[in-house]
């Protein structure tokens, strides 16, 4: 007898072993038809996996987040089924679930085209209509190897070789197609009807550019058509907001092959950059940070002592001169310790907060570069706090509060916080990691805010809290971090004199709020579709004449606005005023001032907004107050976005 406890506390008894599907059938045929998988004592299992002992069971349906993820994972297998039917010579690699969808990496001698993707999607739909069952078989290792050898699936064999301790594997049979997976998967293809293949890209085996190139096909899948339609609309909107397109249209920046991963900032884009830097400089000054500047090229001996040379060398640009090896700094932290080490510090000097707008370079793979979002040369709003163990919790708590306030200024209110713990490749003792992880967890707990763990995702020198923003399209961007690091100060001989007049190694907190200026500007561009809040707009005001007679008056107004600290330009072209207004609206300039004879005579301006609102006639002084009020609101007042 097997006793099954359901979420409502009721108990059902079964003679002998049972399955999630049988439990669902005992409740009702409707639930059984909707069953995708189940949770047995908290663990996800396939609908037909045997339950051999008393257990707590939850039925998973497409209405559950887990159910949608299972549908997506099964769609990846369905994609494999379709691809192998159409192109038998290709070799399947991996097909995981990702945010909002899935992908499959495939090795093919022939490059895939959009026509190939359309054919694959069509075949997937045909297979779904066959309404076949997906069969799971736990298969001994030797038999699994034989199956994939016979099918010529070299990459599956390599994956098996990576798991020497596994004596058996789960094989999922989609008719004649077989794939290897831990599961769970849907019991039948009828659950996979709501999907769409979305794009293709290149990838490398094991993510290493030295290995063979693969072709990656992306897709999305949902529980119902309405969710799919909403997602497709969101993707289309994201394409309109692509920061590379908007950056070109608004003359913000460009990239070119002669400097891969490096940004050529134009005047408009550099203005946004400078506004961010000036804002962050004041934030840091107001919160007790001292700003420093350190070298960009440093001898390898420092990077060896810090641990970067052994743990991060492949991502560092190096050079040599006069028989010495140097690295262009990928991070600022070792250099900040050098500043701390100049002069003996007392416990009375702590916490010591050092900030730098540090220019860093990392040798990212060329295939991963993506506009401002993934670059090789970037600037961080970087800072390091040297403190005692007893000061960690308060410093982290203060940083959390500061970070959330900064994000609110940029219009981001939906913030996700996660604690990334020790990775396999790391420096320092387990005891130091235990202490550091607990310090961050305690600070998060005491903040009263929701947070989650990210196991194994910490930096090699310490755990960290990651702050992720959810933008206006619901996308999540990881930006800020704070990391507890007891290791680097010790490696680089940092010390202070404690209250007992003894030498002690300080704790080092690595922290950034924006992350990199480049990436954060890219996020802002896409979040606002280029319609920046007034305080961030490259040009806040354009002054336009109706005829040549008002040209001088326009220039006088521009000068008055500039003296008040506003970013203003004039448009004195001999064009119709309607044409000029339309053009400057497309340039996303927040305010347009029109001067005709009446305005010149009265010393006033006619004010229009980029949203098309006519604010009427007012004095220049009144207009300046209007703009200063909008600037003070920062990103708390979201601009109306017009995609026309």
UniProtKB/Swiss-Prot annotation:
Subcellular location(s) per record: Cytoplasm
Q: Does the keyword Zinc apply?
A: yes
One Gene Ontology cellular component term attached to this UniProt record is: cytosol
- Keywords attached to this entry: Aminoacyl-tRNA synthetase, ATP-binding, Cytoplasm, Ligase, Metal-binding, Nucleotide-binding, Protein biosynthesis, RNA-binding, tRNA-binding, Zinc
Region entry Catalytic, spans: 242-533
| CC cofactor | Zn(2+)
List GO molecular-function terms, semicolon-separated: ATP binding; metal ion binding; threonine-tRNA ligase activity; tRNA binding
Q: How is the cofactor bound?
A: Binds 1 zinc ion per subunit.
Q: Which EC numbers does the record give? A: 6.1.1.3
Gene Ontology terms: biological process:
threonyl-tRNA aminoacylation
Q: Which reaction does it catalyse?
A: tRNA(Thr) + L-threonine + ATP = L-threonyl-tRNA(Thr) + AMP + diphosphate + H(+)
Q: Where is this chain primarily localised?
A: cytoplasm
As for family, the record states: Belongs to the class-II aminoacyl-tRNA synthetase family.
Question: What function does this protein fulfil?
Answer: Catalyzes the attachment of threonine to tRNA(Thr) in a two-step reaction: L-threonine is first activated by ATP to form Thr-AMP and then transferred to the acceptor end of tRNA(Thr). Also edits incorrectly charged L-seryl-tRNA(Thr).
What is this protein identified as? Threonine--tRNA ligase
Q: Source species, please?
A: Psychrobacter arcticus (strain DSM 17307 / VKM B-2377 / 273-4)
